[in-house]
Amino acid sequence: MTLDGIFFWFRAVPILLLILIPLVLVHEFGHFLTARLAGIRVLEFGIGFPPKAKVIGHDHETEYTLNWLPIGGFVRLEGEESESDDPRAFSNASLPRQLVVLAAGVTMNLLTAVVLMFIVAWVFNPVLEPSVGSVQLGSPAEAAGLHAGDILVSVNGSGHTSQLLDFGAPDPSTPMRDQLLANQGKTVTLVVRDTSGHERTLDVTLRVPTGNQGALGVGVGTAIVYTPGDPVNAAGQAVSGTWKALGLILVALGDVGHQIATNPTQAPPGVAGPVGIAEEVGNVVTQDNGPMLLLLLAAVLSANLALVNFLPFPPLDGGKAAVMIVKKVFGKKGVGALETATYLVGFALLMTFIAWISFFDILRAGTSGP
């Protein structure tokens, strides 16, 4: 690994932890708050994972701790892992109260995703617009005075844009290329905005392209442009964006399941584990839009935490809820040993899955290099 690569990871990993730790703590705070409101005894709220480094505070029943492994946090409830005689134990709470406490972490992560996307939509309101990536020598674009970085606002009055938070929407550069190609050999009215924000209206005669030439003679890319936002529109974008992000995450999880079942020796497309996410963070922070993209990445990660924890797979919250329901239906004694085995197997499978994803992350990072 080169020196630049070492600096890349030394920068990326701490930033990822600064994103993930608050998201996990928000999740755990949901469990903590609802447990308190439900009258369930909370023994410990920990930042990081044991071994314990320091007790940073306590009240009449809860110890607040700082732990040595800085990878999240946890809430320890009386009677969560085993039966307890304490009437305020989690194991003695009614099923509805247990389910509310388990669902609170997912709910907090969903709300966090919406809030972060709201901030992105209101403060930045990022829009994707087709842009000029490069200009070919002797092309109609060069003759018209186009430069790299210019925004292609419209062709014959027709423009192509999309909201960055509209996940899954078509890249606006594609219909722009198609429109230019459809008008090859014709004179079109082209509206262009330069990097200073000045717009020009140009009459440009497009060529009939040969080989790798384009009709205009530019490499059409996509630029992120900030536009004025308002809170009402931002709220709609935030809710819609979170919903669409959940849909894409669900599709990705389905693709991973299919990949594992059919060809586990190949990397799952479009899916990253901790190493891949750290690499993405490292790439994002070097971009001009780094702060906005980090906020958006945090929102997507929060939505991802919510959806993954909702899955009915022990030891995730959804799996715990499923076990609670089974215990209610069949009785605690009938599923006691099975519950322990289920958690152990589920945890082992979860760790194996993370290791599997991370293996391909490391391979990709090693071949591409930061």
Could you say what each language-model-derived stretch is?
Residues 2-12, 81-96, 104, 108-269, ...:
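PDZ peptide-recognition modules
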Residues 7-86, 308-330:
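Small-residue-rich helix-interface/hinge motifs
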Residues 8-12, 287-297:
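Membrane-interfacial loop-to-helix junctions in multi-pass transporters
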Residues 20-24, 109, 113, 300-309, ...:
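Alpha-helical transmembrane segments of multi-pass membrane proteins
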Residues 261-264, 285, 301-316:
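Transmembrane alpha-helix interface/packing and boundary motifs in multi-pass membrane proteins
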Residues 333-341:
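Membrane-interface alpha-helices at helix entry/exit sites of multi-pass transporters
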Residues 340-361:
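Final/C-terminal transmembrane alpha-helix of multipass membrane proteins
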Residues 358-370:
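C-terminal transmembrane module of polytopic alpha-helical membrane proteins
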